[in-house]
Amino acid sequence: MEANAPKRKEARKSLRIKVISMGNAEVGKSCIIKRYCEKRFVPKYLATIGIDYGVTKVQVRDREIKVNIFDMAGHPFFYEVRNEFYKDTQGVILVYDVGQKESFDALDAWLAEMKQELGPHGNMDNIVFVVCANKIDCTKHRSVDESEGRLWAESRGFLYFETSAQTGEGINEMFQTFYSAIIDLCDNGGKRPPSSMGVGFTKEQADAIRRIRNSKDSWDMLGVKPGATRDEVNKAYRKLAVLLHPDKCVAPGSEDAFKAVVNARTALLKNIK
């Protein structure tokens, strides 16, 4: 071989990763995986019994990835089975049904279960999470809007995608972004790069939007007690207006929350002499 012969570019090392799916029963976890891996939709619901395991190879950027997917049953009955599979995970697919508010509300419980099983030495900050707001094809029955789901995900530094296992909408984009983030994780020594954790808004802003969305009346929305004075109402309003003004807050749902606060103040001041 000649001394000046060009060297072949060395292929980047392939990766082997572990991914798990989490979420309540019947939210479409298995259907999302089948839609991506097998390019098909299974219309008949077949409950996952314990754990469904599969292996697939994908090419993302210039890397070959061997993915071990553990599709975990969502029914509480299978807790004793799935609790063995949380450890040594690089990626988590969190799924809820946009037409079932209870499946969205249960996401916190799923995270708590995982944290408990990982133990005191487990670090969930070094796992890539993607939240799938699934079944968006069923828009007539939607009970969790996009801004609410996106706020929950992004306030935790999670990826967020609107998906439909039935039509395939959002599925490929979700997996490609998910796997790309896991590559960055592995290339960064098993730690999420700092840039992937920035969300552009504060926890205080996210909490305020959630409280406003779930408030039962105008008093509750502004955080004042019934019978509050005009000055107390205006003070509470000014604090929220500064916090949530659309020009200063990029959190999902901030514009609607700001409008709701303006309307709440107007309604309360009409009845205060």
Curated annotation (Swiss-Prot):
It is found in: Nucleus. CDD domains: DnaJ, RJL. GTP binds at residues 23-30, 71-75, 134-137. Coiled coil: none annotated. Residues 217-273 form the J domain. One of its GO terms (biological process) is positive regulation of ERK1 and ERK2 cascade. This is DnaJ homolog subfamily C member 27. It comes from Gallus gallus. The gene is DNAJC27.
